[in-house]
């Protein structure tokens, strides 16, 4: 039986890959190009995290992440009528992947013995940098740099993780609550049009 953090890792990979493939399809990429975008979305943030932690990037040790991304492509192809045509498909899968990857990044960083503030930074990188790479590949302004609550949702989830660590909650419950808080922060921010003020320069 897999532990909760492994479940988060693979589920997040699947969700993020779908979000990348969904956007690639909107740009009329072929299936291979869409797969590449999906893989980059799924492993990009974790790769940067591992490099900063002086670790071998996780997907180089386990090809299963590339296989999960391929399954995401097959999922989109099989259910393209629903996945591609529904406008909120990208948002939902992206929010799911964001929340799950934040806790994966935090947990791995803590396992390496780093302090909590570093773990929150790494959780934010794990959650948001794959999406940044995705947006660059498809020639879009990275979502992380827009006024949307995106990276801040990751930081919020990290703070919730830290607060929960001060309680008697199990590790799995802490990770679940943290991931859920990131997901809900994204949903609420979009639903109620909550955003960060834009820094305007002189015209």
Feature locations, PLM:
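Intrinsically disordered, low-complexity non-transmembrane regions of multi-pass membrane transporters
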Residues: 1, 194-203
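Structural signature of hydrophobic alpha-helical transmembrane segments
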Residues: 2-13, 57-71, 115-127
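Helix-coil boundary and interhelical linker segments in multi-pass alpha-helical membrane proteins
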Residues: 1-4, 50-60, 105-118, 163-174
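C-terminal ends of transmembrane helices
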Residues: 17-27, 50, 74-87, 132-142, ...
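Ordered, amphipathic secondary-structure segments that act as subunit-interaction surfaces
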Residues: 71-108
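Cytoplasmic-side transmembrane-helix entry/capping segments in multi-pass membrane proteins
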Residues: 32-40, 62-66, 87-98, 122, ...
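N-terminal topogenic module of multi-pass integral membrane proteins
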Residues: 1-53
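Short, structured motif recognition centered on aromatic/hydrophobic residues
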Residues: 36-40, 47-53, 121, 125, ...
